[in-house]
């Protein structure tokens, strides 16, 4: 089992954790249907960038 050599300071711990925060999903409005969807993802009805890519 790994055991640290020296104690990490609060500052170093905070610097390491600075990249751990989560961000909310970026949403866009589809041009054809006006539907909200995640950016760079196909909408629920199969459109991507105004083009039908999935037939349901």
Curated annotation (Swiss-Prot):
Q: Where is the composition biased (Basic residues)?
A: 7-16
GO cellular component terms, A-Z: large ribosomal subunit
Coiled-coil regions, chain positions:
none
Biased region (Polar residues) positions are: 21-31
| One biological process term in Gene Ontology | translation
**Keywords for the protein's UniProt record, in alphabetical order:** Ribonucleoprotein, Ribosomal protein
Q: Which InterPro entries match?
A: Ribosomal_bL32, Ribosomal_bL32_bact, Ribosomal_zn-bd
**Presence of keyword tRNA-binding:** no
Chain positions covered by the region annotation Disordered: 1-38
MF-aspect GO terms: structural constituent of ribosome
Q: Which PANTHER family match?
A: 50S RIBOSOMAL PROTEIN L32 (PTHR35534), LARGE RIBOSOMAL SUBUNIT PROTEIN BL32 (PTHR35534:SF1)
The UniProt entry's sequence similarity note says:
Belongs to the bacterial ribosomal protein bL32 family.
Q: What is this protein called?
A: Large ribosomal subunit protein bL32
């Amino acid at each position: 089992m790994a055991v640290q050599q020296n104690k990490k300071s609060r500052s170093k711990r905070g610097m390491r954790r600075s990249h751990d925060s989560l961000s909310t999903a970026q949403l866009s409005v589809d041009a054809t249907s006006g539907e909200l969807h995640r950016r760079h993802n196909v909408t629920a009805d199969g459109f991507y960038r105004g083009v039908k890519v999935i037939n349901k």
